């Protein structure tokens, strides 16, 4: 039986799995396909990817839910399946992870520019993240993994949404370009300081 995630982190390095989409593409899935939908339509492929990472030694299995917010799913006419897709993603990850490994609820960027850089309001972003994270928590994840964020404001809304619905650990990953900053120009020393200030307690 696994111990709480934060306790495990205090004892040793924890190994996460890798990219889901890259391996689904290698298995013949088109890049134009909604990978999150495969939780419902081709679950065996999703589980194959999870199993490969577990066999390689991963301690953490990420749900196949990177793009499973309403704002992204509706681009594939799947906006009404947010809960169903996220619950299925967690279930598939847990079936492979079992009782000993951790399942991280994967939350990716919305694929939209947030204010003041774009038309999507912070409130809209927070609600989209909240809806997804609620389903991930309901499904039984051990932690929330906010992935590949470019905009610090978007990462903040995901953090706030996570705390709206849960006290689970939250991991935030930012995207760094070759020049050492995020695509929106934020340096690591600045976003780490800000994320520390926002860090849920």
Model-derived segments and their meaning:
Residues 1-201:
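Domain-level signal for soluble alpha/beta catalytic cores
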């Amino acid at each position: 039986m696994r111990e709480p995630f934060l306790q495990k982190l205090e004892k040793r390095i924890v190994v996460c799995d890798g990219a889901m989409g890259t391996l689904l593409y290698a298995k013949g899935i088109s890049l134009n396909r909604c990978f999150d939908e495969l939780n419902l339509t081709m679950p065996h492929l999703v589980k194959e990817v999870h199993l490969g990472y577990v066999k390689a030694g991963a301690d953490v299995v990420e749900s196949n839910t990177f793009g499973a917010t309403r704002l992204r799913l509706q681009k594939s006419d799947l906006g009404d399946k947010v809960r169903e897709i996220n619950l299925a993603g967690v279930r598939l990850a847990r079936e492979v992870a079992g009782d000993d490994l951790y399942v991280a609820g994967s939350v990716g960027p919305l694929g939209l520019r947030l204010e003041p850089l774009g038309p999507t309001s912070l409130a809209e972003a927070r609600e989209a993240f909240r809806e997804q994270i609620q389903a991930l928590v309901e499904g039984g994840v051990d932690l929330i993994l906010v992935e590949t964020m470019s905009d610090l404001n978007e990462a903040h809304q995901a953090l706030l949404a996570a705390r709206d619905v849960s006290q689970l650990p939250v991991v935030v990953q930012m995207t760094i370009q070759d020049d050492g900053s995020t695509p929106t120009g934020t340096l690591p020393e600045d976003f780490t300081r800000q994320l520390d200030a926002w860090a849920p307690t």
